[in-house]
């Protein structure tokens, strides 16, 4: 195959990855596998040097420890099977490898926003056309695709199986793309409409943890956006739009209410998780162990007696992999922040588009980590794939700047 055709194939696969991130985990994972094969098949120079593997040490250390704790758990075969959830971590390196330069990274981020804006339109239609009979059920007589999209429409879920996934994906993507609104140029109006549409869909998920993560990401983004007045105006418009929706406003009023039934259940899960951690502080209970042991550790006030996760990512990591595993997991993100922040300080002041990419990635990871205090989003593959894809973008910028003439 000629170089031209090979690059055309890669570009088509990157486009399919973007679409998959927005609508289908099967499409996104398939695209990633084929892109990885493309890198190997073309013997791409970016897979031959250590510089092509950002965050390699913390990711490998975390993965190795996860496998070790699985092998040492009381149900090693079950836990070792669960280590397949480590495979999505390769997304960081695959996306980094297939994006040539900062321009390609900008196109990737822009296309992701537009793909999610399309999903947001579908999500808004889901909620606004929802009949009482479909609030928590599906119409069995409808075609499968229509049934899955327009069924269970009490809360917006897009093409995902549950609203929490859509909320997590939108929180990360909106934080990542907010800084680009200030440098969008002639496309600013259209891009702003796409961003606001996605923000409305985020509100209609009614996922409070995703809202808080989004808010944290926005605050971080505003610290690095020079034309901050534009970003503030857009965010303010989104908030006003959402507060005009009674269900969204009522849901927001319960965020700090400790008497809220969902909050009480999360407190019960937190207590159970801490008890499990005290019993297995070093190596944890193994991957998948929470599902097996939660009925034993659930406190009397817990309504749910079975769960596979604790709605708190750091606690889930610590319980399943021990405190060592938590430290290694934190190392991944600490290393990312240190390197991306250092890059931001080196980006020339006139390289506004590159700065927006780096600030957006930092804001997106902030949103992911804060939202993870209320949901095990590290275990939500769709959310994790989007986050890792965005995390690759600063490293693309870093490589591009290093290759430019002084």
Task: Please describe what each predicted stretch is.
Residues 257-271, 283-321:
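Long extracytoplasmic/lumenal interhelical loops at the membrane interface
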Residues 17, 35, 67-68, 90, ...:
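Alpha-helical transmembrane segments of multi-pass inner-membrane proteins
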Residues 17-27, 318-321, 355-395:
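Membrane helix-loop boundary segments at the extracytoplasmic
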Residues 1-78, 97-113, 183, 189, ...:
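Transmembrane signal-anchor hairpin modules in multi-pass inner-membrane enzymes, especially those
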Residues 121, 125-130, 204, 222-263, ...:
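A membrane-periplasm/extracellular boundary helix in multi-pass inner-membrane enzymes
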Residues 134-138, 349, 401-406:
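Short, Lys/Arg-enriched, Gly/Pro-containing loop segments at transmembrane-helix junctions
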Residues 83, 252-255, 266, 277, ...:
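Hydrophobic alpha-helical segments of integral membrane proteins
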Residues 12, 16-35, 48-53, 64-89, ...:
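Interfacial transmembrane-helix termini
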């Amino acid at each position: 195959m000629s170089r031209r055709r090979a690059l055309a194939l890669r570009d088509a696969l990157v486009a399919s990855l973007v679409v998959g991130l927005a609508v289908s985990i099967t499409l996104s994972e398939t695209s990633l596998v084929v892109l990885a094969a493309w890198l190997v098949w073309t013997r791409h120079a970016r897979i031959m040097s250590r510089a092509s593997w950002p965050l390699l040490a913390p990711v490998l250390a975390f993965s190795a420890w996860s496998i070790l704790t699985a092998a040492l758990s009381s149900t090693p075969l079950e836990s070792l099977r669960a280590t397949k959830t480590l495979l999505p971590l390769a997304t960081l390196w695959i996306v980094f490898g297939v994006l040539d330069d900062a321009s390609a990274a900008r196109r990737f981020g822009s296309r992701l926003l537009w793909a999610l804006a399309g999903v947001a339109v579908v999500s808004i239609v889901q909620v606004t056309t929802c009949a009482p009979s479909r609030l928590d059920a599906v119409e069995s007589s409808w075609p499968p695709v229509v049934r899955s999209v327009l069924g269970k429409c009490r809360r917006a879920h897009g093409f995902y199986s549950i609203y929490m996934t859509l909320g997590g994906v939108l929180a990360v993507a909106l934080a990542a793309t907010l800084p680009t609104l200030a440098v969008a140029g002639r496309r600013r109006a259209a891009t702003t409409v796409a961003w606001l549409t996605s923000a409305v869909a985020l509100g209609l998920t009614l996922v409070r943890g995703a809202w808080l993560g989004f808010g944290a990401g926005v605050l971080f983004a505003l610290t690095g956006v020079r034309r901050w007045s534009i970003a503030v105006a857009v965010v303010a418009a989104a908030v006003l739009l959402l507060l005009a929706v009674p269900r969204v406003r009522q849901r927001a009023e319960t965020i700090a209410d400790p008497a809220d039934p969902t909050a009480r259940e999360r407190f019960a899960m937190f207590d159970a998780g801490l008890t499990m951690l005290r019993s297995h502080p070093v190596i944890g209970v193994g991957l998948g162990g929470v599902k097996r042991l939660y009925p034993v550790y659930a406190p009397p006030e817990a309504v749910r007696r079975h769960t596979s996760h604790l709605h708190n990512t750091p606690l889930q990591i610590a319980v399943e992999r021990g405190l060592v595993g938590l430290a290694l997991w934190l190392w991944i993100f600490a290393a990312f922040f240190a390197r991306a922040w250092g890059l931001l300080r080196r980006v020339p002041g006139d390289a506004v588009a590159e700065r927006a990419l780096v600030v957006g990635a930092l804001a997106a990871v902030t949103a992911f980590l804060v939202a993870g205090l209320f949901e095990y989003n590290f275990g939500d593959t769709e959310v994790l794939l989007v986050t890792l894809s965005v995390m690759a973008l600063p490293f693309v910028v870093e490589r591009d700047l290093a290759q430019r003439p002084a």
